[in-house]
Each structure stands twice: as structure tokens, then as C-alpha cells.
């Protein structure tokens, strides 16, 4: 076979096989090179990517919360909303009456959250295509941050009694907090049946006056909820909120943050009712995340000489709670 015939044959085979490399290998024997694949460059190992749910919300949560240099948080309030506390008119000769107010307080103690990893030292030495140890540390920090952010908004989702559950008396989930801090706002009873998201907009608008937090809050919701709100149409089929900015304006919020963990999130109350949470409206500046000196994230590493393993521990000791009354609105459907 001459060179021209060989060249045409190689390219014809490449069209059928879909790969010039495979075609060259098939015709290698025609020009005296066997095992030509051994001469081809080897595949280059790239640094592995993490397969994980969307975690953009995690950074936003941890950036927005108030960082306190103290792990133990004590909140103290005087409830002066009672009718009996109003200033009174006086008629000469009558007795003046003192008013009595209620003192409300709570303490939040710190708890430890950690993630731990180990790897054989032989593997650390043998893996040369990317920095294995740095990659493991990156994964550990990613998962610790994600767990902390989840605990702040929703709780970690583990059942009571689970040995790994994050103590909800130490990191208080906004969605489950006392009504003094998180105001529960119920959607109309037929909301889930009708899937009419205009009711969501109206319910938020009518209950916005109950929000007493700092500044302009943000809405935390699932991607599906945000999509349904953006797809609300008028009677002519035109989108009422064609952009996120228009939706933010209608809801009177400064930001809309998608939280995958809110998809289908429910909480059960002592009366047996199921509350499906559709959204959380809060300014996380009103959530205090406290840590004493040394309680911030700390990484420890050790070497186990018996098993030839490198071990890593990343942990933080924190407390967390809303510190301002009525600083969150929980938009939910009750069944």
C-alpha cells in the first residue's frame, strides 16, 4: 500500500470510527508500527471536582450573620406592649398606679461542630497529579460551612437523639425559633391545592408589618418557589414579575437567595400538624454567631504510626441565635 492509499484509508476509517486516533491504531500494522498507542501521550489527571448541591447560599448566609467575639449570648428584653403599660391621665385626688412590665431573657451556650478525615500516607505520596492533602482540607471546610449554614436557617435535619445532631439550643434554627423571634405566617388553606403563588405575594405583603428586624431583609426560598413566583401571569398571559428585581420590589426584600434544602422542607409541631416552609424572610445581621477566642474554625492534623495514616480534624465551637424580637417571618403552609 503506497502512502496516498494509506492516507485515504486512514481518513476513511476515521470518518466511520469517529476518531482519528482509533483509525491510526487500526492501520498501524500497515506501516510497521505495532502498539502505537504506547507512543501517544498519556491522559493528564485534573484536580477532581466536588459533586455537591448548590452551595452559593452557604457563603451568603455565613457572610451576612453578625459575628460576635463571645460564644455565650444572653438576650434580655422588656415587654412594654401590654395595654396596662400605657401612660395614664391623672385626676386630682386619685391614687396613681404603677405599671409592671415583663422581663424576657434567654441564654445561648456554644456547641462544637466538626468534620474528620483520614488517608493512608502511601496514597498521599503516590498521588502526584494534584495536591491531595489540600483537596481533602478544601472538602472538609466546604462541608463544615454547609452544615453550619444549614443549622442556622433550618437545623441539621437529624432526628432528636441522633448522636451527631447539632444542638438546637446552641445553634438556634431561624425556622424553628420561638414566636418572639420568628413570626409564623400561614398561607391560605387552599394554597397547596391551587398552587396559586399570587397568594404568596399577597400574604407576604399583608404580614410585612409584623417584621421588626433591622433594615431590609432577604427572602430565602427554594428554586422551585422562586421560579413559580417569577412565572406569575396576568389575565393576558404577561409575566407580572419578569425579573428578579421586580419580584424583590413586590416582596420588599433586598435579596432573593435560593436554598436547595428548602425544597419540600417541613417541620412538625407538638399538635401533630405539618408545616411546609415556602420561604424565610430575615435580615441575618440580626442573627448572632458567636465564638470565643480559639473557638473559630481550627484545623488539627496528626499521624498514626501504627496504621501509617494521616488524620485531619476541622472543628468550630459556636453559638447562634436571633437576638432581635420579630426579626424573621416564616412563610408556611399548614396541614
Region spans (language model):
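Generic recognition of stable, solvent-exposed alpha-helical segments in well-folded globular domains
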Residues: 38-45, 53-57, 131, 135, ...
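Short helix/loop capping segments that flank catalytic or ligand/cofactor-binding pockets
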Residues: 60, 85-89, 99, 126-128, ...
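Beta-strand elements of well-folded, non-transmembrane domains
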Residues: 121, 316-320
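Intrinsically disordered, low-complexity, charge-biased terminal/linker regions in eukaryotic proteins
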Residues: 1-19
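Alpha-helical scaffold segments that mediate packing/assembly in large oligomeric complexes
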Residues: 96, 105-110, 114-203, 330-335
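Extended oligomerization regions of viral-like shell subunits
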Residues: 158-305, 310, 314-316, 335
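Structural signal for terminal/edge beta-strands and the immediately following C-terminal loop/tail
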Residues: 319-335
